[in-house]
């Protein structure tokens, strides 16, 4: 399903996002898997965990920033929306 496809996951560094990336890279061969999130540090940590995955890309942004989100979605085949505001 995701082989040779461009996938964008919003909230990609959250709990669901981390698991989605892990399972997708283990079970499919996406052309691009774009992790979209606001947290630069979590993106950096995630990148260290996947040093040999050329398909994995990172995009800093907030889903409330329409233009930034549209830019991230350019050429994307699938969007997995997992972004949320955490209120603790």
Language-model segment annotations:
Residues 5-27:
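N-terminal Rossmann NAD(P)H-binding glycine-rich loop of SDR-like oxidoreductase domains
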Residues 27, 50-88:
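NAD(P)H-binding glycine-rich loop region in Rossmannoid oxidoreductase-like domains
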Residues 3-5, 30, 76:
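Phosphate-coordination loops involved in phosphoryl transfer and adenosine-cofactor binding
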Residues 8, 34, 59:
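Conserved Rossmann-like nucleotide-binding pocket used by diverse enzymes
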Residues 25-42:
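Conserved glycine-rich Rossmann-like NAD(P)H-binding loop of the short-chain dehydrogenase/reductase
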Residues 42-49:
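Short alpha-helix adjacent to the SAM-binding motif of class I
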Residues 10, 36, 79-83:
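SDR active-site strand-loop-helix element
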Residues 1-4, 15, 55, 64:
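Catalytic, metal-anchored helix/loop core of enzyme active sites in primary metabolism
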